[in-house]
């Protein structure tokens, strides 16, 4: 009630044409309004906003695609935090990374990579985000995606090697204790290098991976060799 005792009129929120509350917030670049939808129990969109976070529009774009196209970095991070699927693709195989790459939105690309978006996702033309960036001459994006791929390749090699070593069905009887220690220590060393080297270049990651493979691959090759059958005891004569 107002001081005069009259009921205060409720302000009616009008969304932009052909939008949901989510895409409305993206187009208006109003991150606070989006947060309010999720966190304010009295908000009129509180019960429906989660269903809209990945809903594609008539143009086939998800909210994250729209944010990526417009270069909305903070909005993209908020969408991801609220459940936007960074792996989501449209019927032609385009994901948010393709849109960010096409429009040269480097900040959004970084946010998507941090959220572990798939660098290898291809559209119907066989293009990853990197190739899309290259086609539109977005050099900074190409360089960043090369850097990100080199880093991910190194980390993935470390991870798969560690998983292989932890699988007794694969390594039992094939690797010596020394072999296992070499793998464990070398993987740990490279993982720690990634963690502490904040200014690593694309070439640095490639060089580190090659050095790791040089040590690890000869040992892992033993896993492809046939196991020697234990010799059976000789039978006694009758």
Language model features with spans:
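Acidic, negatively charged sequence tracts
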Residues: 2-25, 91, 147-238
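Ankyrin repeat boundary/linker residues
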Residues: 15, 56-57, 90, 123
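Conserved ankyrin/ankyrin-like repeat signature
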Residues: 33, 75, 107-108, 140-141
